[in-house]
Amino acid sequence: MLEFETIDINLTKKKNLSQKEVDFIEDVIIVGSGPAGLTAGIYSVMSNYKAAILEGPEPGGQLTTTTEVYNYPGFKNGISGRNLMLNMREQVVNLGAKTFPETVFSIKRKGNIFYLYTENYIYKSKAVIIAVGSKPKKLETLKNSGLFWNKGISVCAICDGHLFKGKRVAVIGGGNTALSESIYLSKLVDKVYLIVRKNNLRAIAMLRDSVAKLPNIEILYNSEAIEVDGKSSVSSVKIFNKKDNVVYELEVSAVFMAVGYKPNTEFLKGFLDLDEEGFIVTKDVVKTSVDGVFSCGDVSNKLYAQAITAAAEGFIASVELGNFLK
């Protein structure tokens, strides 16, 4: 099975003035390598289009940090997010798509050709599919969280959970991500406090049932984390219970934020129409404000952030690509 290549790229780095322009023009370049981008690649090459995938700083996308995916068709016992994405990548490569470990910093159109600028190269194509996904939001209202970033404040349990074995931690959120993170952490830590702003969980029933069976996960409903404290690292979090109108403190060694996602569209400002939250504005599901540029997955679909909907939109983008290139 193919493995993802580890990429160390500073996303704030300015464009390299000595970039080399590649000497080939693709029919389509797909920016991003999550379920949307890889599915778009699969269908594009199956339609005999020359396709290249610029994988970005996180090959495989957010799913590679998900322990188990239970709601993707075809896997009766679930599959790890990483293995699901490795399977997709192997499939698209076997079909003939090119993959490059590159991050796009800007896109320009000159005539009928799109120029995609990365750190080292300028790629060229007749059309572009944007599938860069989104990244976990930081909870800006949590006081002192910036002081303890990577010192007990995290947005990725699978990345950082091992640092807190045998300790007490908190997870903020009530959706699928928050419950998945809590379940994963429950296998490592002594206690998980799941801090839920509302009086119910938004996650799917399977995850809710799994959490209910785990004795070391305690759900705190109608609650907000308002402040973290500590010396060199997190040692406590203050909780405001809205129902009882009381503030109290929990001793924890880490706080994991699972409160939604922000689209990775900073490099598209001024090139495509974005909404007030930064998501790509689309019509007919995948068409953007620029002819020949299509968008699919979480970067434009903020209502249904699921692997299956991202993959479906990747297919739709490949169909619209065909209509554009005719």
UniProtKB/Swiss-Prot annotation:
<feature type="disulfide bond" description="Redox-active">
    <location>
        <begin position="156"/>
        <end position="159"/>
    </location>
</feature>
<dbReference type="GO" id="GO:0005737">
    <property type="term" value="C:cytoplasm"/>
</dbReference>
<dbReference type="InterPro" id="IPR008255">
    <property type="entry name" value="Pyr_nucl-diS_OxRdtase_2_AS"/>
</dbReference>
<feature type="binding site">
    <location>
        <begin position="55"/>
        <end position="62"/>
    </location>
    <ligand>
        <name>FAD</name>
    </ligand>
</feature>
<dbReference type="InterPro" id="IPR050097">
    <property type="entry name" value="Ferredoxin-NADP_redctase_2"/>
</dbReference>
<keyword id="KW-0521">NADP</keyword>
<protein>
    <recommendedName>
        <fullName>Thioredoxin reductase</fullName>
        <ecNumber>1.8.1.9</ecNumber>
    </recommendedName>
</protein>
<keyword id="KW-0560">Oxidoreductase</keyword>
<dbReference type="InterPro" id="IPR005982">
    <property type="entry name" value="Thioredox_Rdtase"/>
</dbReference>
<dbReference type="GO" id="GO:0019430">
    <property type="term" value="P:removal of superoxide radicals"/>
</dbReference>
<comment type="similarity">
    <text>Belongs to the class-II pyridine nucleotide-disulfide oxidoreductase family.</text>
</comment>
<keyword id="KW-0274">FAD</keyword>
<dbReference type="InterPro" id="IPR023753">
    <property type="entry name" value="FAD/NAD-binding_dom"/>
</dbReference>
<keyword id="KW-0676">Redox-active center</keyword>
<keyword id="KW-0285">Flavoprotein</keyword>
<keyword id="KW-1015">Disulfide bond</keyword>
<keyword id="KW-0963">Cytoplasm</keyword>
<dbReference type="Pfam" id="PF07992">
    <property type="entry name" value="Pyr_redox_2"/>
</dbReference>
<comment type="subunit">
    <text>Homodimer.</text>
</comment>
<dbReference type="InterPro" id="IPR036188">
    <property type="entry name" value="FAD/NAD-bd_sf"/>
</dbReference>
<feature type="binding site">
    <location>
        <begin position="298"/>
        <end position="307"/>
    </location>
    <ligand>
        <name>FAD</name>
    </ligand>
</feature>
<dbReference type="GO" id="GO:0004791">
    <property type="term" value="F:thioredoxin-disulfide reductase (NADPH) activity"/>
</dbReference>
